[in-house]
């Protein structure tokens, strides 16, 4: 059996293979609730043959949205809508379902990407006041409000409340978004966190909010639900968050009972220098994988089945996340199975579609 199609687990959640769909914002929600677009989109992904689909960043508060069209889990109406979506998917797919909970921080209040994606001033329609650990703008965005201690404690509770709703909605996996320059990442990085109190300064201070959120969340959420964290392993800045700090953070999270770490990079600064190329983030995942017993997910320009197989077969990571590639090619796992001489589960409605040369592809 190929390594890519071997079963594995994250926490107590069993997965049928090592292929994961990462969170990818669709910017198509209404008042934070999934729409017909989400229902079709996630059903399609769940029928692709992957083991886990992670629903896009869902804001823990309205002002934590990237755009006004983001999903949310800040109220029970959204929870019920998510629950209905998951129930419909599970009628036809055995894929595990997760959700990423997030706060966009100083990168919130922006226009839809296909309308330019620019920052929207708080006084303009679909705009609001952004927040951050320090009053430092992202690029040319509006200057954020620096959170007070009381407001930081509120953010912590908002993440925990969103996780409780995610559990009630029926998600198998909860992912805390601490990457890509959003609020929790802003606290981690010395390039965006200039605080002089207990939430800034040294490594312990900058990681305090994330580790406190995780610790309290893990204590209250059923252990049958896996909880992981997505991080940017480096800011790609000389003065920013870096790989050694990511390794140290991973060790802290592992001690607190974290079930996996999802390793991305960048997003904090417009000055970042990212060396884009196939597998460009895999060495980051490998560096963390070598220093933890937790499962590690690699992501970023992983596009070919043999490439993905090599990553997991050589223990650079335990799982691969296929993002834009699976949007372009929604049956990517089918192609991977055919190229690796594996069989793959499909919905019975699709069993007759296998080409003659792959007549044994489907289980």
Located regions from the model:
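Flavin-dependent oxidoreductase catalytic cores
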Residues: 1-363
């Amino acid at each position: 059996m190929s390594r890519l199609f071997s079963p594995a687990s994250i926490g107590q959640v069993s997965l049928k293979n090592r292929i994961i769909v990462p969170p990818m914002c669709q910017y198509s929600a209404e008042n934070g609730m999934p729409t017909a677009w989400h229902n079709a989109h996630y059903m399609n992904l769940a029928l692709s043959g992957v083991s886990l689909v992670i629903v896009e960043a869902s804001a823990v508060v309205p002002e934590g949205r990237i755009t006004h069209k983001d999903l949310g889990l800040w109220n029970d109406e959204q929870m019920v809508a998510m629950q209905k979506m998951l129930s419909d998917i599970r009628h036809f797919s055995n894929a595990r379902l997760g959700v990423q909970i997030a706060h966009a921080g100083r990168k919130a209040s922006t226009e839809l990407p296909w309308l330019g994606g620019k920052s929207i001033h708080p006084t303009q329609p679909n705009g609001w006041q952004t927040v951050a650990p320090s009053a430092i703008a992202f690029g040319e965005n509006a200057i954020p409000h620096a959170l007070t201690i009381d407001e930081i404690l509120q953010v912590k509770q908002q993440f925990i409340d969103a996780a409780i709703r995610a559990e009630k909605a029926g998600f198998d996996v909860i992912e805390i978004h601490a990457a890509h320059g959003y609020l929790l990442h802003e606290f981690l990085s010395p390039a965006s966190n200039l605080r002089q109190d207990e939430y800034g300064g040294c490594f312990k201070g900058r990681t305090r909010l994330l580790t406190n959120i995780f610790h309290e969340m893990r204590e209250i959420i059923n252990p049958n639900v896996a909880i992981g964290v997505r991080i940017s392993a480096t800011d790609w800045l000389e003065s920013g968050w870096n790989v050694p700090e990511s390794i140290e953070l991973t060790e802290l999270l592992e001690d607190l009972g974290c079930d996996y770490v999802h390793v991305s990079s960048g997003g904090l600064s417009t000055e970042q220098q990212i060396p884009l190329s196939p597998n460009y983030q895999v060495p980051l995942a490998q560096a963390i994988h070598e220093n933890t017993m937790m499962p590690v997910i690699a992501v970023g320009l992983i596009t070919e089945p043999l490439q993905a197989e090599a990553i997991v077969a050589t223990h650079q990571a335990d799982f691969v996340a296929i993002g834009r590639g699976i949007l372009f090619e929604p049956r990517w796992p089918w192609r991977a199975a055919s190229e690796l001489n594996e069989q793959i589960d499909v919905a019975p409605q699709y069993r007759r579609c296998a080409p003659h040369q792959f007549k044994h592809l489907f289980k």
